[in-house]
């Protein structure tokens, strides 16, 4: 479960926060406009955040990664944005 402290720490200058509650956070990067769904799963040995991603609002989500914390997932998203903004070649659908 995400704590209020974790939710309050989300960088609102970097992200548009669409949803933020104890189990789900939906963000849109203001840099790439990619949409991210972060879902908290409670497991017997701790928690994991499953990260879903889509490039456009009209696209379906796909699984992007898993992280052990909300903070780590957000750092990974920012790293992905840097990868996108530093010249990643566009992926073309076949």
Q: Which residues fall in each region the model found?
A:
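Compositionally biased, intrinsically disordered low-complexity segments
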Residues: 20-22, 28, 38, 44, ...
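Glutamate identity and glutamate-enriched acidic tracts
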Residues: 6, 42, 47, 82-84, ...
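Mixed-charge, Lys/Arg-enriched low-complexity segments
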Residues: 53-94
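Low-complexity, intrinsically disordered short peptide segments enriched in small/polar/basic residues
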Residues: 15, 47-48, 71-74
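Short aromatic-glycine-(Arg/Gly/Cys) micro-motifs in beta-strand/loop hairpins
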Residues: 33-63
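Negatively charged, low-complexity tracts enriched in Asp/Glu with abundant Ser/Thr
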Residues: 1-33, 58-59, 90-94
């Amino acid at each position: 479960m995400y704590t209020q402290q974790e939710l309050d720490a989300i960088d609102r200058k970097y992200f548009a926060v669409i949803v933020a509650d104890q189990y789900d956070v939906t963000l849109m990067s203001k840099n790439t406009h990619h949409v991210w769904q972060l879902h908290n799963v409670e497991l017997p040995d701790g928690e994991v955040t499953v990260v879903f991603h889509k490039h456009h609002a009209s696209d379906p989500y796909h699984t992007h990664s898993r992280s052990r914390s909300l903070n780590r997932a957000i750092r990974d998203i920012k790293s992905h944005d840097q990868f996108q903004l530093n010249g990643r070649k566009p992926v073309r659908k076949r």
